Amino acid sequence: MVEPLLSGVVLGLILVTLSGLFFAAYQQYKRGNQLNG
């Protein structure tokens, strides 16, 4: 019963990491546009 929980945790971590990276890139992109414009 531990494997499904572990796979769920790993999947959650991957999703959180991807969303975090995307959010950081979006913030940097917005900041760059503000500086250029």
Swiss-Prot record:
Family according to the record: Belongs to the PetG family.
Predominant location: membrane
Protein's membrane topology: Single-pass membrane protein
Keywords, sorted A to Z: Electron transport, Membrane, Photosynthesis, Thylakoid, Transmembrane, Transmembrane helix, Transport
InterPro entries, sorted: Cyt_6/f_cplx_su5, Cyt_6/f_cplx_su5_sf
Name of one Pfam family that matches: PetG
Protein's job: Component of the cytochrome b6-f complex, which mediates electron transfer between photosystem II (PSII) and photosystem I (PSI), cyclic electron flow around PSI, and state transitions. PetG is required for either the stability or assembly of the cytochrome b6-f complex.
Signal peptide, first to last residue: none
Source organism: Trichodesmium erythraeum (strain IMS101)
Biological process according to GO: cytochrome complex assembly; photosynthesis
Protein known as: Cytochrome b6-f complex subunit 5
Cellular component aspect of the GO annotation: cytochrome b6f complex; plasma membrane-derived thylakoid membrane
Oligomeric form and interacting partners: The 4 large subunits of the cytochrome b6-f complex are cytochrome b6, subunit IV (17 kDa polypeptide, PetD), cytochrome f and the Rieske protein, while the 4 small subunits are PetG, PetL, PetM and PetN. The complex functions as a dimer.
Protein location: Cellular thylakoid membrane
Listed transmembrane segments: 5-25
Molecular function terms, GO-annotated: electron transporter, transferring electrons within cytochrome b6/f complex of photosystem II activity
